[in-house]
Amino acid sequence: MPFKYHAGHRHHTLLRVLSRPKPRYRVTNRSEYDASLKRRGSLTVWFTDEAIQAWRAEPRTTPGGQSHYSALAITTALTMRMVFHLALRQTEGLIESVIGLLGLDLEVPDYSTLSRRGKTLEVPPLRRPATGPLHLLVDSTGLKLGGAGEWLIEKHGTSRRRSWRKLHIGVDADSGEIVAAEVSGKDIDDAAMVDALLDQIDDPITAFIADGGYDQDRVSDAVAERDPDTAILVPPRLGAVVSASAETAPTQRDHHLRMIAERGLIAWQKASGYNLRAKVEASISRYKRVIGDTLRSRTDRTEATEIALAAATLNRMLGLGRPSYVRIA
């Protein structure tokens, strides 16, 4: 965001700011990182003995219909569908081919079973390894549900309103893994989803970092209710003023406002650690490049299942290897 450096006189410095060279970085573990990227696309598939035994659902002991396939089988199929961008019938064919190539005597859930079970599937919660304090980065983005494609809009325009959902995620700044994910309607305020994201996290939160859209009392109240010692790094909105108790009992926001007034926004970002927020934007970019920018599901429950499986899949891919880099210019 080059404009923030010259907000007061940007019309005089536009060309100079845009011509400023971008920072350059060098990856220090290129061979290991390249190998991890190749492993993300590997078609090597195997079934452990435990997975074979758990493929069929355990018989119910209560009244009601019996599930034929376990949650493991449904999760496996829906995850492969997501990674390879398949329709449900194509997913059924892929799983059938894999099981046939491995010579296993396992039945394959059909497309209607995958669709039905996706509505009730309980995806295991995202678990963060104990690696130290959690600096939580929060942001949201839009995911398409349907409507005219980009080329059709560019060529002919569109008379139909496009449908969207909002993806809300919380990212661990240290590992880059997604630790919380929610989906909502496009008109839901980002701040309204903070409670739902915090409910998915068991670890203590050292810092909560988000953009100015989260500069609301209900956000700071929700974070403080969970842990009063959590640092809340959210830039105050334009025109913000200190609280009435700023002289006697200043809030974190009051301290931020004073520092910004004294030293400027950029100095505050560097000193506070707010610049870590770029990592959640990288996670959103990774989601759209790997999973896609469109939801395949059409109901609230299956959308939630899709989001949870996507987050778990991205975390597994990230666990294969991450780049280490240093700035060189």
Where are these regions (language model features)?
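Helix-centered, glycine/charged polyanion-binding patches within enzymatic domains
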Residues: 10-12, 18-22, 212-288, 297
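Short arginine-rich
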Residues: 102-105, 316
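Polybasic low-complexity intrinsically disordered regions
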Residues: 59-75, 79, 83-89, 93, ...
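Helix N-terminus capping/helix-initiation residues
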Residues: 29, 109-110, 299
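Acidic, contiguous segments within the catalytic cores of piggyBac-derived transposases
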Residues: 35-38, 42-55, 251, 264-280, ...
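Charged, often Cys/His-bearing segments associated with DNA-binding zinc-finger transcription factors
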Residues: 1-64, 76, 105-106, 116-132, ...
